[in-house]
Amino acid sequence: MGIISFIFALAEDMLLAAIPAVGFAMVFNVPQRALRWCALLGAIGHGSRMIMMSAGFNIEWATFLAALLVGSIGIQWSRWYLAHPKIFTVAAVIPMFPGISAYTAMISAVKISHFGYSEEMMILLLSNFLKASSIVGALSIGLSIPGLWLYRKRPRV
């Protein structure tokens, strides 16, 4: 993949990630002045995950690092705009949720229930379930660590 096609793919990925970030921010009643920042943070998070995955990271670690980035930027923006960090961060990480892995695991469970046990369906179910669970765990831990680091009351040592 050439650099120009990668930049276009990255721009497309970031633009398409900003749309659900704004949509979920509207569902969560985020103030209108913060919607553009939710879109930008969602685009930054999803774009950074895409860059890391194309650099060779697996999706779980790339999601964890992208969530760390989103959490850190959200805390900084909350100080600038005098708002809670969750206003920016929660809607921004939703585009990174593992919809395809969770859906495939659910469909595999339904097929096992309907057609009976088969080894390949069980492998598909477990691998996709563990992948989706790991991504959700990476999102939640990565989003909470910057707050634990930056709002710490006691000295680090």
Swiss-Prot record:
Query: By what name is this protein known?
Result: Probable succinate transporter subunit YjjB
Q: Name one GO biological process term.
A: succinate transport
Q: Name one GO cellular component term.
A: plasma membrane
Top-level division of the source organism's lineage: Bacteria
Which chain regions cross the lipid bilayer?
A: 2-22, 55-75, 87-107, 129-149
Tell me the compartments it is located in: Cell inner membrane
The record ties this protein, via InterPro entries, to:
ThrE_2 (IPR024528), ThrE_Dicarb/AminoAcid_Exp (IPR050539), YjjB (IPR020914)
Belongs to which family?
Belongs to the ThrE exporter (TC 2.A.79) family.
Organism, by scientific name, is: Klebsiella pneumoniae subsp. pneumoniae (strain ATCC 700721 / MGH 78578)
Q: What keywords does the record list, in alphabetical order?
A: Cell inner membrane, Cell membrane, Membrane, Transmembrane, Transmembrane helix, Transport
Q: How does it sit in the membrane?
A: Multi-pass membrane protein
Q: Can you state the subunit structure given in the record?
A: The transporter is composed of YjjB and YjjP.
State the protein's purpose. Answer: Involved in succinate export with YjjP. Both proteins are required for export.
